[in-house]
Amino acid sequence: MKFGVVVFPGSNCDRDVAYVTRDLLGQPTRMVWHQDTDIADLDVVIIPGGFSYGDYLRCGAIARFSPVMQQVVEHAQKGKLVLGICNGFQVLTEAGLLPGALARNQDLHFICDRVPLTVESTNSLWTQAYNPGEVITLPIAHGEGRFYADEATLSEIEDNGQVLFRYAGENPNGSLNNIAGICDRQGNVLGMMPHPERASDPVLGGSDGLKLFQGLLEKVVALA
């Protein structure tokens, strides 16, 4: 399985993600510059965290217009896998690949912490390596991570089983319905505010995030 990690001006988690896919999982991985327009060789595109374009105007608002994003949209429309982490989640909502939006944290402060999450569904490529209802711990680091959607959209997301992760216990940012991560209706696009790549190597204090990536590989092996 070949991974591509998109690099925008201001991205700062791209190498963390590549370390997981290339070094921990041994998968071919290439860094995709924001001006690239050929990603046909990739199976999974990951938009990492950071501050793309300095978060000017609105988080992810400028990044969505980068040349590579049109290719990412087409990649997703073909049913291929796309993962947006933190700022990447914001970019995916701006690009219309995921519903809702990410607004300023309820307390208006930047949050950097480790938080418990409940795995809401394992009927997904992204979460199949977890157990239903499993509580995992992942780092968060964001100032605009409060998931918001209008009532109709929120109901649709819930009814379709698109919520894959919820904050367990205290809601750190005021996200509606404690939402921490959602997928699109097809299930091939995932956006999440917590950072699984920062909890993949036990040396860093936890490996709960590694299963997110391992599940994809297990699916490929099963289909082989």
Swiss-Prot record:
<comment type="pathway">
    <text>Purine metabolism; IMP biosynthesis via de novo pathway; 5-amino-1-(5-phospho-D-ribosyl)imidazole from N(2)-formyl-N(1)-(5-phospho-D-ribosyl)glycinamide: step 1/2.</text>
</comment>
<dbReference type="GO" id="GO:0004642">
    <property type="term" value="F:phosphoribosylformylglycinamidine synthase activity"/>
</dbReference>
<keyword id="KW-0315">Glutamine amidotransferase</keyword>
<comment type="subunit">
    <text>Part of the FGAM synthase complex composed of 1 PurL, 1 PurQ and 2 PurS subunits.</text>
</comment>
<feature type="domain" description="Glutamine amidotransferase type-1">
    <location>
        <begin position="3"/>
        <end position="224"/>
    </location>
</feature>
<dbReference type="InterPro" id="IPR029062">
    <property type="entry name" value="Class_I_gatase-like"/>
</dbReference>
<comment type="function">
    <text>Part of the phosphoribosylformylglycinamidine synthase complex involved in the purines biosynthetic pathway. Catalyzes the ATP-dependent conversion of formylglycinamide ribonucleotide (FGAR) and glutamine to yield formylglycinamidine ribonucleotide (FGAM) and glutamate. The FGAM synthase complex is composed of three subunits. PurQ produces an ammonia molecule by converting glutamine to glutamate. PurL transfers the ammonia molecule to FGAR to form FGAM in an ATP-dependent manner.</text>
</comment>
<dbReference type="GO" id="GO:0005524">
    <property type="term" value="F:ATP binding"/>
</dbReference>
<keyword id="KW-0658">Purine biosynthesis</keyword>
<feature type="active site" description="Nucleophile">
    <location>
        <position position="86"/>
    </location>
</feature>
<dbReference type="InterPro" id="IPR010075">
    <property type="entry name" value="PRibForGlyAmidine_synth_PurQ"/>
</dbReference>
<keyword id="KW-0378">Hydrolase</keyword>
<feature type="active site">
    <location>
        <position position="197"/>
    </location>
</feature>
<dbReference type="GO" id="GO:0004359">
    <property type="term" value="F:glutaminase activity"/>
</dbReference>
<dbReference type="GO" id="GO:0006189">
    <property type="term" value="P:'de novo' IMP biosynthetic process"/>
</dbReference>
<feature type="active site">
    <location>
        <position position="195"/>
    </location>
</feature>
<keyword id="KW-0547">Nucleotide-binding</keyword>
<keyword id="KW-0067">ATP-binding</keyword>
<dbReference type="Pfam" id="PF13507">
    <property type="entry name" value="GATase_5"/>
</dbReference>
<keyword id="KW-0963">Cytoplasm</keyword>
<keyword id="KW-0436">Ligase</keyword>
<dbReference type="GO" id="GO:0005737">
    <property type="term" value="C:cytoplasm"/>
</dbReference>
<protein>
    <recommendedName>
        <fullName>Phosphoribosylformylglycinamidine synthase subunit PurQ</fullName>
        <ecNumber>6.3.5.3</ecNumber>
        <ecNumber>3.5.1.2</ecNumber>
    </recommendedName>
</protein>
